[in-house]
Each structure stands twice: as C-alpha cells, then as structure tokens.
UniProtKB/Swiss-Prot annotation:
Its EC number is 4.2.1.20. Belongs to the TrpA family. PANTHER family: TRYPTOPHAN SYNTHASE ALPHA CHAIN, CHLOROPLASTIC (PTHR43406:SF1), TRYPTOPHAN SYNTHASE, ALPHA CHAIN (PTHR43406). The gene is trpA. This is Tryptophan synthase alpha chain. Tetramer of two alpha and two beta chains. GO terms for molecular function: tryptophan synthase activity. Pathway: Amino-acid biosynthesis; L-tryptophan biosynthesis; L-tryptophan from chorismate: step 5/5. The alpha subunit is responsible for the aldol cleavage of indoleglycerol phosphate to indole and glyceraldehyde 3-phosphate. CDD domains: Tryptophan_synthase_alpha. It catalyses: (1S,2R)-1-C-(indol-3-yl)glycerol 3-phosphate + L-serine = D-glyceraldehyde 3-phosphate + L-tryptophan + H2O. It comes from Brucella suis (strain ATCC 23445 / NCTC 10510).
Length: 279
C-alpha cells in the first residue's frame, strides 16, 4: 500500500530536492490556534507535518517542547482532540502527509485498536513513537502496518551495525536520523558527520532519511539538506509560537504568522540548497 508519505517523497525525489518536515505541538497554545498553524504550514513550504501528541512526561524532549506540551495539556488538549486536528486539516488538504509523534502511554490509554482506527479515519499517515523500541513491534508497529499507517523509526549516532537492522526492520515511510544524542533543541550537529551517517544508513535501507534534532535556522537546515532526503525542524517552530504568547501561555501576538514566516524561510533555504547542489 502506498501512503501519502511514499507519494510525497517520490515526488520530491523526482524534483531533486529534500523535504522540509515541520514539527509542532498539537493544541499549543490552544486547539484553535494550533489548528490554524497546522493549516498554514503547507502554504508556507512544509512538505510533511509532524503533529506532536502532548504527554506529561516527555523524556526525549527539551525544555521548549516540554513547555509546549504542558501549555497544550493545560488548555485541555487530549489525544482525541489531536486526532480531530488531523481530521479538520484533511478537509482542506488531502496530500500533505501527517505524522503523529509522541509517546506510547497516551495511545495505550486510548486503546491501540481504537487509536489506529481513528487515526486512519482522520487521515494520519505515519507514527513516530519515541519510547517503543523494535523489540515491542507487536504492541503498535505491526498493528499500524496492518492498518496502512507508516511506522517511522529513530536512529542515532550510537545505533551500531548490530542494532541498525533491528531498528530498520518493519520501518516504513522514512527513517528519522537523530543527528545527536540528547534532547530535542540541543546544539547543531556536525554536518560532515551527518553526511557520513546518512550514507551509512542508506546502505541498509531504500527508505528516505530525514535528519532532525538541533536544526534551528535556515542556514543550518540548508547545511543538513545537502546530505539528507529531508530536514526536520521542531524546536525552532515551537519557539516561534511561544514568542507570541504571554507569560501565562495565552496568545498576545500572532503565533500563526511567526510560525509560517520561519517555515517559509526554512523552505526557501532547503529548496535552494539541493538546486545548487544539482547544478
């Protein structure tokens, strides 16, 4: 089965450019604003949307994304409302892939079978569940595959040759290479090392490789784009939204404009990089 993710990356490969994958937190700072951000992302240049599922104990996330999740939870965001966001987005956009990203606990509480049914009905194309290793594929990965939803794995600089085949087994959609160890929003990675890592992973898979963690500026995104099939930006977008909120996390400025202006700049930079490389 071909998903929107497969189709999108095939289109981009034909165009000779990498994807811009944009992450933001579902329900941050509130449901209405977050949905406006989501709907505005493709026009700003996002090729794939990662929709964060807020969770109270996000161990892999840095302070910015933790704060975004807390704002969303405080505003009443639930997994059902995050699925609602996907469904509402799909009423206007049937081509941009949606990948829900987060932790297993909210899905487990919601009910795996129910979640996959509702996710598919809402137009969700892929899942990234950061705390479910390949040894637990039977929990969610294999059921997701059967439901026609891509299950996207994370690889890191410490994923060795013995571990890599296990990580890639049952992976689909794309591979998310975490360009450094630690939490999201940390310092930028060494782009030469990223290039080496991507080439190494590609020896073991035909899936597109997207690189994230630590990409904050258009310049950094462009540097990563020369090595990868996609660049993932999350913390910078979350920070752009947060910069338009008051100390209580309520909207005081224009978070939609702040997010889309950044994404537009990132998209221009990413697209130009590959075009230059191809000339």
């Amino acid at each position: 089965m071909t998903t929107r993710i497969d189709t999108k990356f095939a289109e981009l490969k034909a165009e000779g450019r990498p994807a811009l994958v944009t992450y933001f937190m579902g329900g941050d700072p509130d449901l209405e604003t977050a949905l406006k951000v989501m709907k505005a992302l493709p026009k700003a240049g996002a090729d794939v949307i990662e929709l964060g599922m807020p969770f109270s104990d996000p161990m892999a996330d840095g302070p910015a994304i933790q704060a975004a999740g807390l704002r969303a939870l405080n505003a009443g965001q639930t997994l059902a409302k995050t699925l609602y966001m996907a469904a509402e987005f799909r009423k206007e956009d049937d081509t941009t892939p949606i990948v829900m990203m987060g932790y297993y606990n909210p899905i487990y509480v919601y009910g795996v079978e129910r979640f996959l049914t509702d996710a598919k009905a809402s137009g969700v194309d892929g899942l990234i569940v950061v705390d479910l290793p390949s040894e637990m594929d039977a929990e969610l990965c294999i059921p997701a595959m059967k439901a026609g939803i891509n299950f996207i794995r994370l690889t890191t600089p410490t994923t060795d040759d013995k571990r890599l085949p296990k990580v890639l087994h049952n992976s689909s959609g794309f591979v998310y290479y975490v360009s450094m160890n630690g939490i999201t929003g940390a310092a930028i990675a060494d782009t030469a090392k990223v290039g080496e890592a991507v080439r190494h992973i590609k020896k073991s898979t035909d899936l597109p490789i997207c690189v994230g963690f630590g990409v904050k500026t258009p310049e950094q995104a462009a540097a990563i784009a020369t090595h990868a099939d996609g660049v993932v930006v999350g913390t910078a977008i979350v920070n752009a939204i947060a910069g338009e909120l008051d100390e209580k996390g309520k909207v005081k400025g224009d978070p939609v404009a702040a997010a889309t202006q950044l994404v537009h700049a990132l998209a221009e930079s990413v697209r130009a990089t590959r075009l230059e490389a191809a000339q």
